[in-house]
C-alpha cells in the first residue's frame, strides 16, 4: 500500500492506493504531528463513480431537503398514477376518492419515512442495506430483484414515449423503432450524470408538470359543467373505500419500499428525509391521482396526455409526457444501477452503459404490447415487497434502530433466515384473502423475520477490531 501525504491548511489528505482503487482519507492536523494525534474522518471515494454505489454517502456530499424533494417528487410524477386516478373515478364518488387518496398516501408516507430514515442514518443504497440481513454474498442475489423490475418498467416507458413520438409525427415503423431506442438512451443520460442532474432536471420539469396537470384538470371541470357537477358525480360501477385505498397504495408501494433509499441516503437530517418523502407522496402523488380522477369523470379518460390531445393541444401533451416520463425514468435507472453495482463487480458507469444498451435493444420488441411481460413484472412486484419488510424489521426490531458503521462492519457471507422468511411470506401473501399483495408482503416479511431471528439468532454482522 502506497501512502501520499498532501497538506491542506488545517487538514492532511492521505491517498491510499490499493488494488481496489484510490481512496482519500481526511485527517485533522494538530500542532503535535504524532500518529496518536491523527483523527480519521469519513472516507471519500475518488474513483470515477461519484455516486457512492459501494460505500456510505459522506456528510460532505449530502444534499439539501429541497434538492431531495425535487428528485423524489420528480420520481413520483408518473402517467400511471393519473390513470389510476381515472380508474378510481369509475368506482368512487369524488368525496370517497379524496378520502382514499389521503389515507392511501399517508400509509405510503409511513413506509417511505421508515426506509428513508434508515438510508439517512447509514448513507447506504438499498442494495448495501441488504448486507446487514442477507450477508455479504446473499446480498448480491437479494438485490437483483429490484433492478429487474425497474429495468423492465424503464424499457416499457421508454418504448411508450418513442411510440407516442411516432404517433404525433406520423413516423414509419423504422422511425418508431429509432424513436424508442433514442428514448432509452437519452433518458439514461440523466442516470449517468447522477443525483445532481436529476435535481436540475426536476427544477425545470416539476413546475411544467404541475402547471399542465392543474390546467388540464381545470379545463376538464369546465367541460363537465363546474365543481358542483364533479362532487355530484355518481359512479356506474361502485367499489368499496378499502379497495380504493388499496389502489392508491399500489401506485407507489414498490418504490417507497425500496428505491427511495437510493435518494434519501443523501439526506442531512431525519427531518429532511421525512419532509422530502412526505411532500413527494402527499403532494406529488395526490396531484397526479386527483387530476387523473377529474379527467376521468369529465372526459371518461384518466390519462391527461390523451385529454390534452382531445383538446387539440399537441405540444402541451408532448411537454407533459416528456417531463413526466423523463423525471421518473432517470431516477428509475439510477436506482437500478446502484442495486446492480452491489451484485456485479462493475463500475457504476460501466453498468449503466450496459443497462442502456440492453434497454435500447429491448425497445425494438415493442414491449408495451407484450401482455406476458406485464404479468412477469407484476409478479415480481409481489415478490419484492417482503424484502422491504425484512430490511425494516432488521433495522428497527433486530438492531434497535442502529447498525454497526459500514466501514467497521464484518459480514457473514450468507444468512438463511431472510430467505426462509421470504419464502414463507410469499406463501402468506398467496393465501391472505384480503388487502394488497405488496402490502401484505411487507407486513408478513417484517413480522416473520423478527420472529425467526429472535429464535435462531444468526449474528450476521459484527464490528471489526482495530
Predicted regions and their residues:
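Membrane-interface "cap" regions at the ends of multi-pass membrane proteins
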Residues: 33-95, 239-247, 265-272, 456-466
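Hydrophobic, membrane-embedded alpha-helices of multi-pass small-molecule transporters
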Residues: 65-81, 217-223, 233-295, 309-330, ...
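Transmembrane alpha-helical segments of multi-pass small-molecule transport proteins
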Residues: 71-75, 143-147, 158, 169-193, ...
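Membrane-water interface regions at transmembrane-helix termini and the short interhelical loops
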Residues: 86-91, 116-117, 160-170, 183-205, ...
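Extracellular loop-to-transmembrane helix junctions
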Residues: 87-116, 138-140, 281-282, 444
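Hydrophobic transmembrane alpha-helices that form the core helical bundles
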Residues: 139-171, 325-342
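Membrane-interface loop-to-helix entry segments
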Residues: 178-183, 187-222, 277-281, 376-388, ...
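C-terminal membrane-solvent junction of multi-pass transporters and transport-like membrane proteins
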Residues: 388-466
